[in-house]
């Protein structure tokens, strides 16, 4: 029997109850596209991932709690910031480091897109209501004043798209979707502020907020601010999952022993150190 591409997924974390949770929509979208989802545990022991990562052909970083502002050099001054999930954040940083090093396909959804940007050195608006509208009114978006303000946390059911995004036609995402404008759902109060120097913005909301990013010089490392898993089976956006699985299948066939590594993790040193130091040593 042909082996299905395995997609590692990070669960949501409830630090108070010491629980993880996982919406089945993500797994359903991966299965429908022809992949096999694998829910990853949250562990501070890197040897767990030395065993698991060689089995994995691609990753999905899902939605969830806000990222700790300290990870991108900001202060924790907003009462609107969710509970932080340090174990999850450090697993996602490990995954991104691994996928970046070995060019494994990875898709970030909502918070997952924000995590790609943060892990690669970008920053976030900690709360769009407090920060982003004022920035728009000052005209930082290509010098345009008076851009429309959107409800980025929609009141309608999440299975209903509520606002348009414009996609750069020459981007990977634009070529996948085959359209320049598409309607999406929206359920977030944070967003990309300063882009990582290794990331390109490839889609925007009408108010100028970044809605999709791609990591430069990587085969398939894409983030979207919306939730395409709500549209599986009835929307053009499911082709993004199809493309992820296709890229993962190619990686499984052609990447050989890229995953056989020893992972070394050391604690951050110094006040400016925002992430643990991760190194990968090839097994011989």
Language-model features: where?
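N-terminal beta1-alpha1 cap of cysteine-dependent amidohydrolase-like domains
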Residues: 1-109, 118-125, 129-183, 189, ...
């Amino acid at each position: 029997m042909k082996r299905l591409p395995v997609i590692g997924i990070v669960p949501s974390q409830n630090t108070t109850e010491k629980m993880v949770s996982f919406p089945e929509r993500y797994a359903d979208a991966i299965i429908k596209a022809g992949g096999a989802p694998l829910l990853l545990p949250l562990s501070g022991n890197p040897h767990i991932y030395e065993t698991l990562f060689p089995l994995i052909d691609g990753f999905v970083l899902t939605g969830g709690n806000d990222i700790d502002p300290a990870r991108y050099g900001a202060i924790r001054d907003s009462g609107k910031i969710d509970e932080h999930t340090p174990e999850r954040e450090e697993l996602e940083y490990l995954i991104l480091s691994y996928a970046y090093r070995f060019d494994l396909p990875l898709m970030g959804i909502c918070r997952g897109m924000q995590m790609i940007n943060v892990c690669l050195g970008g920053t976030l608006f900690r709360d769009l209501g407090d920060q982003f509208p004022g920035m728009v009114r000052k005209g930082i978006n290509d010098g345009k004043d008076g851009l429309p303000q959107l409800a980025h946390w929609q009141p309608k059911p999440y299975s209903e798209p509520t606002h348009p995004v414009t996609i750069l036609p020459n981007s990977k995402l634009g070529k996948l979707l085959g359209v320049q404008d598409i309607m999406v759902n929206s359920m977030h109060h944070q967003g990309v502020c300063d882009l990582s120097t290794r990331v390109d913005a490839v889609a925007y909301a009408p108010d100028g907020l970044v809605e999709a990013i791609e990591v430069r010089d990587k085969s398939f490392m894409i983030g979207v601010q919306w939730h395409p898993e709500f549209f599986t089976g009835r929307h053009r956006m499911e082709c993004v999952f199809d493309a992820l699985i296709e890229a993962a299948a190619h990686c499984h066939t052609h990447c050989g022993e890229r995953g056989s590594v020893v992972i070394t993790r050391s604690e951050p040193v110094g006040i400016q150190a925002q992430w643990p130091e991760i190194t990968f040593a090839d097994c011989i």
